[in-house]
Regions:
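Active-site palm subdomain of RNA-directed nucleic acid polymerases
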Residues: 132-145, 572-590, 615, 692-727
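Non-catalytic, peripheral interaction segments enriched in hydrophobic/basic residues
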Residues: 297-298, 303-306, 587, 716-717, ...
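Conserved pre-catalytic core of RNA-dependent polymerases
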Residues: 424, 469-685, 724
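Catalytic palm active-site di-aspartate
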Residues: 146-149, 223, 497, 536-539, ...
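Basic/polar low-complexity segments
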Residues: 174, 196-197, 204, 229-235, ...
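A shared catalytic/ligand-binding motif for oxyanion handling
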Residues: 1-352, 565, 707, 712, ...
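Conserved, non-catalytic sequence blocks in retroelement Pol enzymes and Pol-derived host proteins
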Residues: 67, 154-164, 186-192, 218-220, ...
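Short amphipathic alpha-helical interface segments
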Residues: 277-280, 436, 500-501, 535-538, ...
Length: 942
């Protein structure tokens, strides 16, 4: 587009408002911004917002805010569609005693760059000269807005005071310019006297862009909003509303006809040909979906609908505002006051009707819940009410600067995308540590290099020569039934990979086309090759709750892989898991990702052994280990070595697993920006169904000497725990150290780095042992000291084993969820609906891991029983004087202790069949007991 064309002129508005309480005037602010067609930047003074409070304004994000005094407060809002905006953080520390904040819009092809500041200068205070010198020394275009509380005839005040003279001098000395046009910016509500106190200033570089200034009507404050308009020569190319294809709108008959009429695929003979066939399959399915499903506009986020009556009142309110503006231009103060009275009354009426409408919506949801029979739809309806109440975690601003551990910073969305990608590339590198065994690494690498036919396949080699193990069930023909079985375990609406093919689409494939896919997957198995296009991931980043989202490490990467590729991964994982189980190749200590194995058995085992130690007046020393980036840093050659040496799998199956790990890539997608493609040299792919099983194989051969020492070993995926019972703490620690030395040797060989800072040592004892100093453990170069509590598989164990910290935690979370029941109860939900919600939404918090704390002190279990009592009262709307037994009878609900006991008795039957440790504890639980008064979980369950 020609830069001189009128179409290339792009307006950019900055609006400053002294809001006098942003929460109180939030609705008025939203209406006003809508009337203005959503200006780009809003600066606010006197927000009067407590630091812990948050405020949301539709279509805007809060980039910067500050509260130095409860009566002050400043905030800058930026329209959500404006990218490349960062907060200027150093100004808060530079001027700690002043109310000033700032943001920067970075220079792009669409915007010349702009720095915007707002400050609030309290009455009778001389403006800080250092602020103006700082603003003057900045490069680029700068705007400073604020309520300066200074009067000067030069900007429209009725008089000039001492503060106004000082401010005028500062403006002149620092080459700043006033954009105001002498309009009054405040009207005293009592005397009607008008003054000009709010200003918008700019530097010389920005003056050439200035196109206009005007004053708007007050919105809940005695100050008038002031507007400044700049104009740039660029084309912002605003994005139109996006379109999408919805799977439920697909013409499935047409979809099947297109796929059935597709040409048959030539059977690939080499890995290179297999890659081409995989890409062709993706193209055919994608084109069939596009031709049979129309494009539709993306659905807008759910909003509470306004009634026609409310819309008419909002329209009338806007009309009154226009009349008030006209009266202000005529200086008709009496008429202005009369209209303002009408506006305020109408605003209160609108708020009242909105409140009634929200109540009506709640009643509608409650009625829908009472009628809904389908559990899935029941929970979807419930989440519409629950999510706004429970999810209080603030959404990170898109404008914040993100930094990584290496000191790199990213401001724009593209920079952030590349920053995340670079970090993931560094994480997925072959682990190196000065203590690792270099000779063993060379031996394993040489073994892999000297046996290329076992681990790798030539891209151009044909499958012709039979090999040992070709008749193994692992390499059997893939059937359509096997594909359907694995598809049935997948969520229909699961996120899709780069190819855009979902599980829902694959479930609708016709049988003839499914046979084509089954034949291709069989050939991949025989070739020992995993198609390259299925090894490329789209990675998105989700901030970890409760962590600082400005740190790149506090974002969790979610890899979206091809659903077609994940079907092959599921088939490989299913076959390999059955092979390992049938041949008893899993270590007895491993419970993670195995059929009929669960976290409960490991929690019960630890709790039971600790209670048995109490009975014999022993202490338990437990070590909970944390492997650094466990899944992300698995040594690939180490995995290949173990597949061949430890499991003796067929060569072709080893090759396809090796191919699955080799040459994997990802691209980070962050707020519409793609990073460069990065390679992953180590680790298992996140989000893959096969990755957990590969990790289990990698850690399946922990040293047997650990168990021979008399230590108990528990593995659940990457959660590893060691513990032992002893008569003294020192002896228990010494046994743990010996076992840890064996484990450390294994880690040095297999290049696993244990994190000493995150590993926890817990001494569990009810004895009053007098020791001058508790011994510590040494792990590599780290010293591990005892801690009062440690979390294991989601349950908080403490040194006295009374589970007070854990019960306090789950009780706190349950009480938050109980608020949802209270809201629904007020909305008219039926008692049966509320009790049903308690059973599916709150009680599971108490049930998980309950086998471990079943023998907790009575006063601790009573705490969660009280929460259940309150839930029943809320559900049945019962007064506080009704007896607890009668309440439970009315709700047809057992006491929580009885419920947990019955539940764990059923679990114990399954556990005893699969875990010999629990079976042994059950048979010998009373042997050598010195303290028979101590009750263990198995004493309650058996």
């Amino acid at each position: 587009m020609d830069s001189n064309s009128p179409k290339s002129l792009y307006k950019f508005d900055v609006v400053h408002i002294n809001i006098r309480g942003v929460l109180a005037n939030n609705d008025n602010l939203a209406e006003y911004l809508q009337e203005l067609n959503y200006p780009e930047i809003i600066t606010l003074n006197e927000t009067k917002l407590a630091p812990e409070k948050r405020v949301t304004v539709n279509n805007y994000e809060c980039v910067s805010r500050r509260e130095t005094h409860r009566s002050y407060g400043s905030m800058i809002l930026v329209r959500s569609d404006i990218g490349n905006v960062v907060e200027i953080n150093n100004i808060k520390t530079r001027f700690m005693n002043d109310e000033i904040i700032g943001i920067e819009i970075l220079e792009t092809a669409l915007h010349p760059g702009l720095k915007v500041f707002t400050m609030y200068n309290p009455p009778n205070k001389v403006p800080n000269a250092d602020i103006f010198r700082y603003i003057s020394n900045l490069s680029g275009k700068v705007i400073l807005s604020g309520d300066f509380n200074c009067k000067n005839l030069s900007w429209g005040s009725t008089k000039t005071d001492r503060l106004g003279e000082d401010l005028q001098d500062l403006i002149n000395e620092n080459d700043l310019y006033i954009l105001n046009d002498s309009s009054k910016t405040r009207c005293d509500p009592f005397s009607g006297k008008e003054e000009a106190l709010d200003l918008i200033l700019c530097n010389h570089e920005n003056l050439s862009l200035f196109r206009g200034f005007w004053v708007g009507p007050p919105i809940g404050s005695d100050h008038f909003p002031i507007h400044s308009r700049q104009q740039f020569r660029s084309d912002p190319n605003p994005t139109s509303r996006e379109k999408e294809r919805r799977i439920e709108s697909t013409d499935w008959k047409k979809f099947e006809q297109i796929l059935n009429s597709s040409t048959s695929l030539a059977a690939p003979k080499t890995p290179t040909e297999a890659d081409l066939v995989a890409e062709n399959l993706t193209r055919e399915i994608t084109k069939a979906f596009q031709d049979s499903c129309p494009l539709q506009y993306k659905r807008q986020p759910y909003r509470t609908a306004f009634t026609p009556e409310i819309k008419a009142m909002v329209k009338e309110k806007r009309k009154l505002r226009r009349l008030k503006n006209a009266a202000m231009e005529r200086n008709d103060i009496t008429h202005v006051r009369h209209i303002m009275t009408k506006i305020n009354r109408l605003g209160n009426d609108i708020k009242g009707l909105q409140k009634l409408e929200r109540k009506h919506q709640l009643e509608k949801h409650c009625e829908q819940l009472s009628r809904e029979v389908n559990p899935k739809k029941f929970f979807q309806t419930f989440k519409k009410v629950a999510n706004p109440i429970i999810n209080s975690e603030p959404t990170p601003s898109s404008f914040q600067i993100i930094s990584d551990e290496f000191g790199n910073e990213a401001k724009t969305d593209q920079e952030k995308s590349d920053l995340f990608a670079n970090r993931l590339e560094k994480v997925h590198q072959e682990p190196s540590y000065r203590g690792f065994n270099a000779e063993w690494k060379k031996s394993v690498d040489d073994h892999t290099t000297n046996n290329p036919g076992t681990f790798l396949v030539d891209p151009h080699s044909e499958y012709a020569v039979p090999e040992d193990g070709d008749d193994s069930p692992l390499l059997g023909e893939v059937t359509t039934q096997e594909i359907r079985y694995n598809l049935a375990k997948c969520k229909t609406k699961s996120a899709v990979g780069l190819d855009g093919i979902s599980y829902g689409l694959l479930k609708k494939l016709p049988e003839t086309y499914l046979k084509k896919i089954a034949g291709f997957l069989t050939i991949c198995l025989r070739l020992g090759h995993f198609p390259s296009s299925w090894k490329h991931a789209k990675t998105i980043l989700i901030p970890k709750p409760g962590k600082d989202s400005k740190q790149a490490k506090n974002h969790r990467p979610i890899s979206l892989l091809s659903c077609l590729g994940k079907i092959l991964e599921r088939i490989l994982a299913d076959r390999l898991s059955k092979h390992l189980e049938q041949n008893n190749l899993f270590a007895k200590s491993q419970s993670g990702f195995r059929a009929k194995r669960m976290t409960t058995e490991q929690l019960l085992r630890l709790s039971e052994e600790c209670h048995n130690a109490f009975k014999t007046q022993k202490v338990t020393a437990a070590l909970f280990l944390d492997a650094e980036a466990a899944f992300d840093k698995c040594w690939h050659n180490g995995i290949r070595y173990k597949l061949r040496k430890n499991l003796k799998l067929p060569n072709r199956f080893i090759r396809i697993i090796s191919s699955f790990l080799t040459d994997r890539t990802l691209q980070v997608f962050y707020r519409g920006c793609w990073s460069r493609k990065v390679g992953l040299q180590a680790g298992t792919p996140q989000g893959s169904p096969l990755s957990p099983l590969i990790y289990l194989i990698f850690v399946n051969d922990l040293p047997q000497e650990i168990v021979d020492l008399g230590l108990s070993l528990s593995q659940y995926a990457d959660d590893t725990a060691l513990w032992t019972a002893a008569y003294t703490v020192a002896f228990g620690i010494s046994k743990l150290q010996k076992g840890l030395n064996f484990l450390e040797g294994w880690c040095r060989r297999w290049r696993v780095k244990l994190n000493g800072d995150k590993s926890k040592l817990l001494i569990i004892s009810r004895l009053r042992e007098k020791t001058s100093e508790t011994p510590c453990l040494q792990l590599f170069d780290d010293i591990i000291k005892p801690v009062p509590t440690a979390r294991f598989l989601g349950v908080e164990f403490d040194s006295r084993l009374n589970f007070a910290p854990h019960i306090q935690d789950i009780n706190g979370r349950a009480n938050k969820r109980l608020n949802v029941l209270r809201v629904l109860s007020r909305g008219g939900a039926t008692p049966s609906t509320l009790t049903k919600l308690y059973g599916m939404y709150i009680r599971p918090l108490f049930e998980y891991g309950s086998a471990a704390f079943l023998a907790a002190p009575k006063n601790q279990l009573e705490k969660i029983q009280k929460t259940q009592n309150e839930a029943i009262r809320v559900s049945l709307r019962l007064p506080s004087y009704i007896r607890i037994n009668l309440m439970h009878e009315a709700a047809s609900m057992p006491k929580l202790q009885d419920r947990l006991t019955d539940l764990n008795k059923k679990l114990l039957l399954t556990i005893k069949q699969n875990n010999e440790h629990i079976e042994h504890l059950a048979s010998d639980r009373s042997a050598n007991s010195i303290s028979p008064n101590i009750i263990s979980p198995l004493d309650i369950l058996l």
